[in-house]
Amino acid sequence: SDGRNVAAKAFHRIGRTIRDECCSNPACRVNNPHVCRRR
């Protein structure tokens, strides 16, 4: 489970970068509304 936790953290870090880039791109934001949803 430790390895899975490390992988999840790495994925989350990468995912946040992709999300930020996508959400700053109007076309990407329109095509991926679930990515840019803020709570």
UniProtKB/Swiss-Prot annotation:
Family matches, as InterPro entries: Conotoxin_a-typ (IPR009958), Conotoxin_a-typ_CS (IPR018072)
4-hydroxyproline found at: 33
Molecular function (Gene Ontology), one example: toxin activity
Origin superkingdom: Eukaryota
Organism listed in the record: Conus arenatus (Sand-dusted cone)
Residue ranges the record assigns to the propeptide: 1-17
Subcellular location(s) of the protein: Secreted
Documented effect of changing residue 30 to L: 3.4-fold and 1.5-fold increase in inhibition of alpha-7/CHRNA7 and alpha-3-beta-2/CHRNA3-CHRNA2 nAChR (ArIB[V30L])
The entry's keywords: Acetylcholine receptor inhibiting toxin, Disulfide bond, Hydroxylation, Ion channel impairing toxin, Neurotoxin, Postsynaptic neurotoxin, Secreted, Toxin
Tissue: Expressed by the venom duct.
Entry protein name: Alpha-conotoxin ArIA
PROSITE patterns (UniProt xref): ALPHA_CONOTOXIN
Lineage: Eukaryota, Metazoa, Spiralia, Lophotrochozoa, Mollusca
Family designation: Belongs to the conotoxin A superfamily.
Annotated stretches, region: Ser-Xaa-Pro motif, crucial for potent interaction with nAChR: 24-26
Disulfide bonds: 22-28, 23-36
Main location: secreted
Description of its domains: The cysteine framework is I (CC-C-C). Alpha4/7 pattern.
Assigned GO CC terms: extracellular region; host cell postsynaptic membrane
Remarks, miscellaneous: The mutant ArIB[V30L,V35D] is a potent and selective competitive antagonist of rat and human alpha-7/CHRNA7 nAChRs, making it an attractive probe for this receptor subtype.
